[in-house]
Regions:
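Short, polar/charged loop or turn motifs at beta-strand boundaries
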Residues: 149-172, 194-199, 261-265
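A short, amphipathic beta-strand motif
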Residues: 27-36, 118
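Short Pro-Gly-centered beta-turn/loop motif in secreted/extracellular proteins
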Residues: 68-86, 160
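Structural motif
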Residues: 32-43, 140
Length: 961
């Protein structure tokens, strides 16, 4: 009893001491003092804290601390109580004395008071006044600090005629551009503003490539906090590292644009017209383009070109429109885009395939030629109304329509042996003969020729309503959303096919003329409510509840036109021709046609907890746990000639996401991150039905009512450390899946028919690990290393599939283990104004399998790429040289070395640009790919854009100049 009383007494004394200490104050505070001319931090100033009567309260100490990922000097002291104070800073030899009065009210919830950065004014220097030759214009200050904002003076950076904003930013200290990603001191810029407006943050390419430097007054970089004074809701919620490009007064409103035309060899062409109008309230930009060089014109975050490594030969016509409109009082804020595109794509593909079976592998070759023409229209909008009131809400309508026409032909055959190894390039001619000759005929299983035509459209429309309520003082946020959507697909497919059987003479050739009509539509509505609350400075919790209802309808009608007299011959009835309605209905394949309707109700609850411990605004420890729970009920009615059934199920899907992070502070920080993910997936209702589809003469698909849910486990680890010459990091992850839903395969060696059925399989897993060094070097002199990186990575994959042949009764697990060892090295060197970037990749692949006839794969891939850029006044030259070499492919044309070269030469003028572009100078590029799993190996070569040379002329216009 006495011990308990003594304990209570000590606790009471401790609480009294704590309360008295809080009452008396003793609150630490800090401040950074800078040179007002250079913005550099100074550590040699005498700093005193004075009270309102100028009596000395404390002498400030200067220490090195971590601020915004770098070490800086910071002055610190103690505030004894709430009240008025004066901060006195002196250094007589260099600065005039600085007196900074301030008032502070101490609160119990505070840990520290941070004063704004102070800037000391330098004393006048007589020597500088005597130098008459030095003019202010010639020595413009390139940048200075305005409190926590760094301000770059645009006129202090010289650019040549025809330059654009990205050229100006590249000349500014501490700013780097990687594509359209902007970095300031290595940290990505989250918000890009133009005159304080974020109209172009989602399509930075628009202003980086088109705003000329002469329009820019200054560039401001700062860490934006939540702004409660803005009348526009979007701007109030903006936060993070921000770059604001401020225009000169005469360019606060403008209209500019450019037009480009290009003609090249091999009938290549491109044309483009761009326009941009801007004011403090609105932005309107448009782009119209056409080309047949596989280029994708975009006004988006990253410009994308498909012709360096892309497949196919594509002509594209495109029109894009983007707009922003902000009402000055914040009553409404509108933004959106509209895009129309027409594509004409030609694809040629050659495939070599090996299928693994215990009774012997099966070899195949095929050729595909296709043409796809498509028209797409899409539009997306976001309308915020009453954004300056508590009644604000946001509407987001979207719509997309696509119409596609395909015409393709294919030829393929399967064999008992690899009979193509000695045929070389003549294999396709031998396969195309009306009658197969020896040695192909004796080892052939079947040969198939197909002509197919498709015509269809798809439609996707949705409308979203969002509303949120925020209580900042309580740290609470409540959001509501309601989404309605509609999807529709309708496709007509015409098929002429012929299959010849060689292994089994009793099977006659299969000739088909089919017409397939499919219709699909889906209607759905979803409501969601989310709540987030902060529990002190370090903890926050949130939950999201979603409820949705959807209905699907799918109809397929397959007509066997070859059953009609005279319709078996494709010559008399070409592809796309249909008989009369009565004759058409008489050929309906009821066993392979179907109608089904599905109703689904989903309810999910997502629980999230996050802990974050920070020191000096940097997170030192972080824990995140996310647990989504999903309960859904499905009801499916499926009917055709053979089955009419209704099925339903109720299922619960769980998931767990957990992560832990730790960071140390200092000059050589260490970052550690670990994550675990558990997720479940369930088979579709159609997979669970006992149905059979044999509409394809060589493929039969079946359902499996005994499928189980699959479960995936993922472990991730990341570790990085700052070293004297850069950063070194280690990353590893491992994933394995229980009851993975795969497709089993039963093969008939006499006909070549394969029967597929979904099955649960265990044993699939993937492991990856990599070590990377990113070098950091000081850029000094005319010769220096701008960047260096080296990465070693290992990828281990175990793929398990089920396959057998009809003469066997049991399935056999086919296991293939793929092992990859990769090294990637990159280095950038600046040599007297010439930038040389070299990237090298070496990959070794070793694959083994448990099949008795599986031949181990030892394949090498070597890629060495060099980019050379040089600028001299208004001339710019660049070249991309890439060498690729492959070994270990069965298909001999793939085992070749390729030397690839792209070149550009640009001459810039104030009003126009001239450009010479050379693509694939040596005409050697190929689209090569290889895929291996437990069921087989596939090697493909796909056509790509061929060599061309193009001249381009760009004319620029601006209403202010």
């Amino acid at each position: 009893m006495e011990r308990r009383r003594l304990g209570f007494l000590l606790l009471w004394c401790f609480m009294c001491m704590t309360c008295q200490a809080q009452k008396n104050g003793d609150m630490p505070f800090s401040v950074v003092i800078r040179d007002g001319s250079t913005g550099e931090v100074v550590w040699y100033v005498n700093a005193l804290l004075l009270d309102a009567d100028s009596a000395v309260v404390d002498t400030l100490k200067c220490d090195r601390v971590l601020r915004k990922s770098s070490m800086e000097y910071e002055y610190s002291g103690i505030l004894p109580k709430s009240g008025k104070y004066i901060l006195k800073c002196t250094f007589d030899r260099l600065f005039t004395p600085l007196f900074f009065p301030f008032e502070v009210e101490l609160r119990k919830s505070q840990r520290m008071v941070r004063l704004p950065d102070l800037f000391m004014k330098r004393k006048d220097e007589p020597q500088a006044q005597m130098l008459q030759e030095v003019e202010v214009v010639a020595t413009k200050l390139k940048f200075y600090f305005d409190k926590d904002t760094v301000v770059y003076n645009a006129d202090a950076f010289k650019t040549v005629a025809g330059s654009v904003l990205e050229d100006l930013l590249k000349k500014m200290p501490d700013i780097q551009l990687k594509g359209n990603t902007i970095l300031y001191k290595g940290n990505p810029v989250r918000n890009l503003l133009l005159n304080g407006k974020d109209f172009f943050n989602r399509d930075r390419h628009t202003i980086l490539k088109h705003i000329p430097p002469y329009m820019v007054k200054e560039v401001r970089v700062f860490d934006k906090k939540e702004d409660s004074n803005s009348l526009i809701k979007r701007e109030r919620e903006m936060r993070g590292l921000t770059m604001d490009v401020r225009l000169k007064k005469e360019y606060s409103t403008f209209f500019l644009g450019d037009a480009t035309a290009g003609l090249g060899t091999d009938q290549r062409y491109m044309g483009q017209i761009f326009g941009l109008a801007f004011s403090s309230r609105m932005r309107l930009s448009g782009l119209a383009s056409l080309n047949n060089v596989n280029k994708i014109p975009v006004m988006s975050y990253e410009e994308s070109y498909q012709n360096w490594g892309g497949f196919g030969d594509c002509a594209r016509d495109n029109i894009q429109l983007r707009y922003n409109l902000d009402e000055p009082l914040g009553l409404y804020s509108l933004m959106g885009d509209v895009e129309l595109e027409y594509k004409d794509d030609l694809v040629t593909r050659r495939t070599s395939e090996i299928k693994f079976y215990q009774t012997g592998d099966v070899f195949g070759r095929s050729a595909f030629n296709g043409r796809t023409r498509s028209f797409d229209f899409s539009t997306n909008h976001s309308f915020n109304f009453l954004g300056n009131t508590i009644w604000d809400f946001t509407l987001q309508p979207s719509f997309r329509y696509s119409h596609v026409k395909n015409r393709d032909s294919s030829l393929g055959a399967t064999f008992e042996k690899d009979v193509f190894s000695h045929l070389g390039k003549g294999w396709l001619d031998s396969l195309s003969l009306p009658v197969l000759t020896e040695p192909l005929r004796s080892d052939a299983i079947n040969r198939r020729t197909v002509e197919e035509m498709e015509d269809g459209h798809s439609l996707d429309a949705s409308l979203r309503l969002d509303k949120d309520l925020t209580w900042k003082q309580a740290g609470q946020n409540l959001q509501f959303s309601l989404i309605a959507n509609y999807k529709e697909n309708k496709h007509r497919t015409y098929y002429h096919g012929n299959v010849d059987y060689y292994e089994n003479p009793s099977l006659s050739s299969d000739r088909r003329n089919n017409y397939n009509l499919t219709k699909y539509n889906k209607r759905g509505i979803e409501g969601a409510i989310s709540y987030k609350r902060k529990l002190g400075e370090r903890n926050d919790v949130s939950f999201i509840y979603r409820s949705s209802h959807s209905s699907n309808e799918d109809n397929r009608a397959l007509y066997l036109l070859h059953l009609l007299d005279g319709w078996e011959d494709s010559a008399s009835h070409p592809l796309g021709e249909l008989p009369s309605t009565s004759e058409l209905f008489s050929t309906l394949d009821g066993a392979n046609s179907h109608d089904y309707q599905k109703l689904q109700n989903d309810n999910s609850l997502n629980l999230n907890y996050r802990y974050s411990y920070k020191e000096n605004r940097q997170e030192k420890y972080g824990v995140s746990i996310n647990i989504p729970l999903k309960l859904y009920h499905e009801k499916l009615h499926y009917s055709n000639q053979l089955i009419d059934t209704t099925a339903s199920r109720t299922n619960v899907i769980t998931r767990v996401d957990a992560s832990f992070s730790h960071s140390t502070l200092g000059e050589k920080p260490i970052k550690l991150w670990f994550s675990y993910n558990f997720s479940q997936s369930s088979p579709s209702m159609l997979q669970l039905l006992n149905i059979r589809d044999n509409s394809d003469p060589l493929v039969i698909t079946e359902g499996n009512p005994h499928l189980k849910n699959a479960a995936s486990h993922y472990f991730g680890l990341y570790l990085s450390k700052r070293i004297p010459y850069g950063d070194i990091s280690f990353e590893a992850n491992h994933q394995f899946v229980d009851n993975q839903i795969a497709t089993s395969r039963v093969y008939n060696r006499l006909s070549g028919v394969t029967r597929y059925r979904p099955q649960n399989i265990d044993g699939n897993n993937t492991t990856r690990a990599s070590v990377r060094w990113n070098g950091r070097f000081k850029r000094k002199g005319k010769i220096h290393i701008s960047n260096f990186s080296n990465q070693w990575s290992v990828h281990l994959n175990k793929n398990v599939d089920l396959s057998t042949t009809e003469e066997n009764t049991d399935f056999t697990q086919s296991v293939v283990r793929n092992r990859y060892l990769t090294n990637m090295t990159g280095i950038g060197i600046s040599l007297y104004g010439i930038l040389l970037v070299t990237n090298a990749e070496v990959e070794f692949r070793h694959s083994t399998g448990n099949s008795p006839r599986f031949q181990d794969i030892n394949a090498w891939k070597v890629q060495i790429g060099n980019t050379i850029k040089y600028e001299y006044k208004s001339w710019r030259a660049s070249s991309e040289i890439k060498y690729e070499r492959y070994w270990g492919y069965n298909h001999s044309p793939m085992n070749k070395g390729l030397l690839l070269c792209n070149m550009e030469l640009v001459r810039k003028f104030s009003k126009c640009d001239l450009k010479l572009e050379v693509y694939d100078l040596f005409n050697q590029y190929k689209g090569v790919d290889m895929y291996v799993n437990g069921q087989g190996k596939i090697e493909t070569i796909t056509n790509i854009l061929r060599r061309y040379l193009m001249f381009q002329l760009t004319y620029k216009f601006n209403n202010k100049k």
